[in-house]
């Protein structure tokens, strides 16, 4: 380089960049932190599945086809079971048709 300030044409890069692999071959030993984290996740999953929520269901009476509204409180998996029952052989009857049955 000549002069007080370098210019781009004066800078010559002789080395080409080498690609660096981001995957390393190191393996970490199981630590207590990982075990604690897995236990915490399992506890949270159990608590999440046992949380009760209210669900509003709108269906029709199997006798007169009028709308019937239900509110149930259950867990997520249980509402899926109820959904399967309603699509299957379970029939809901309105209060007017119930005494006639």
From Swiss-Prot:
Location, primary (coarse class): host cell
Keyword GTP-binding tagged: no
Natural source organism: Human papillomavirus 13
Annotated region described as E7 terminal domain, given as residue ranges: 1-40
Subunit comment: Homodimer. Homooligomer. Interacts with host RB1; this interaction induces dissociation of RB1-E2F1 complex thereby disrupting RB1 activity. Interacts with host EP300; this interaction represses EP300 transcriptional activity. Interacts with protein E2; this interaction inhibits E7 oncogenic activity. Interacts with host TMEM173/STING; this interaction impairs the ability of TMEM173/STING to sense cytosolic DNA and promote the production of type I interferon (IFN-alpha and IFN-beta).
Chain location of the short sequence motif Nuclear export signal per the record: 79-87
Protein modification: Highly phosphorylated.
Subcellular location: Host cytoplasm; Host nucleus
Keywords: Activator, DNA-binding, Early protein, G1/S host cell cycle checkpoint dysregulation by virus, Host cytoplasm, Host nucleus, Host-virus interaction, Inhibition of host innate immune response by virus, Inhibition of host interferon signaling pathway by virus, Interferon antiviral system evasion, Metal-binding, Modulation of host cell cycle by virus, Oncogene, Transcription, Transcription regulation, Viral immunoevasion, Zinc, Zinc-finger
UniProt name for this protein: Protein E7
Originating gene: E7
Recorded domain comment: The E7 terminal domain is an intrinsically disordered domain, whose flexibility and conformational transitions confer target adaptability to the oncoprotein. It allows adaptation to a variety of protein targets and exposes the PEST degradation sequence that regulates its turnover in the cell.
Molecular-function GO terms, alphabetical: DNA binding; DNA-binding transcription factor activity; protein domain specific binding; zinc ion binding
Pfam families reported for this sequence: E7
Placement of sequence motif LXCXE motif: 22-26
One Gene Ontology term from the biological process aspect of the record: DNA-templated transcription
Organism classification: Viruses, Monodnaviria, Shotokuvirae, Cossaviricota, Papovaviricetes
Membership in a protein family: Belongs to the papillomaviridae E7 protein family.
